[in-house]
Each structure stands twice: as structure tokens, then as C-alpha cells.
């Protein structure tokens, strides 16, 4: 099981990510697209990196908006995996 990060580690990692916010024990970003088709295309681009990492985000789709939430459920909070996947997602257009 992945090890939980300390509050100091979480703040340090979060400061390196643009467009992500800490919401309790979760890391979140919301992306806005031109339309539903572009939003779904973005979600489809998340499949490969999530599968490769063995770490899957929670995803909410609302027409042209996609909210991505990361947390390590089995550890009960944020781990390095969450920040690694967030960094990868940040590079996806």
C-alpha cells in the first residue's frame, strides 16, 4: 500500500501543480472545454496514463466541464501516486 504524505509534503507537492486545488484529503482540477465532445475526448485521454500508473481518478462530467479528483482510497488520503498522476494529467490537452 502507498504511504500517506505528511501535510508538509502535500503542500510542497501541491505548490508544483498549476490548476489543482487541495480539497481535504483530495486533489482536484476542473477543465472547461468548447463542448461535450471535447470534454469526452479529454476523458478518453486519461485512460492510458491511469491504467499505466494503476491509479484511477474520480471523474465528473457536466456538459463541457470535467472535474478530476485524485486520492488514494486504500491509504485514506494523498500519496505520491496522486501527485504523479496529477502531473501527468496536467500535460494532457
UniProtKB/Swiss-Prot annotation:
UniProt cross-references to Gene3D superfamilies, sorted A to Z: Transcriptional coactivator/pterin dehydratase
GO molecular function list: 4-alpha-hydroxytetrahydrobiopterin dehydratase activity
Key words of the record: Lyase
InterPro entries in the record: PCD_sf, Pterin_deHydtase
Pfam families: Pterin_4a (PF01329)
Reaction catalyzed: (4aS,6R)-4a-hydroxy-L-erythro-5,6,7,8-tetrahydrobiopterin = (6R)-L-erythro-6,7-dihydrobiopterin + H2O
Any one GO BP annotation for this protein: tetrahydrobiopterin biosynthetic process
EC number(s) stated in the UniProt entry for this protein: 4.2.1.96
Domain of life: Bacteria
Family from the record: Belongs to the pterin-4-alpha-carbinolamine dehydratase family.
Alphabetical list of NCBIfam families matching this protein: PRK00823.1-2 (NF002017)
Name the UniProt record assigns to this protein: Putative pterin-4-alpha-carbinolamine dehydratase
Species of origin: Nostoc sp. (strain PCC 7120 / SAG 25.82 / UTEX 2576)
Lineage: Bacteria, Bacillati, Cyanobacteriota, Cyanophyceae, Nostocales
Amino acid at each position: 500500500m502507498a504511504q500517506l504524505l505528511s501535510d508538509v509534503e502535500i503542500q510542497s507537492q501541491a505548490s508544483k501543480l498549476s490548476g489543482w486545488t487541495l480539497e481535504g484529503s483530495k486533489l482536484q482540477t476542473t477543465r472547461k472545454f468548447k463542448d461535450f465532445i471535447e470534454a469526452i475526448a479529454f476523458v478518453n485521454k486519461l485512460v492510458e496514463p491511469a491504467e499505466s500508473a494503476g491509479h484511477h481518478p474520480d471523474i465528473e462530467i457536466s456538459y463541457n466541464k470535467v472535474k478530476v479528483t485524485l486520492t488514494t482510497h486504500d491509504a485514506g488520503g494523498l500519496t505520491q501516486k496522486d501527485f504523479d498522476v496529477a502531473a501527468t494529467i496536467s500535460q494532457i490537452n
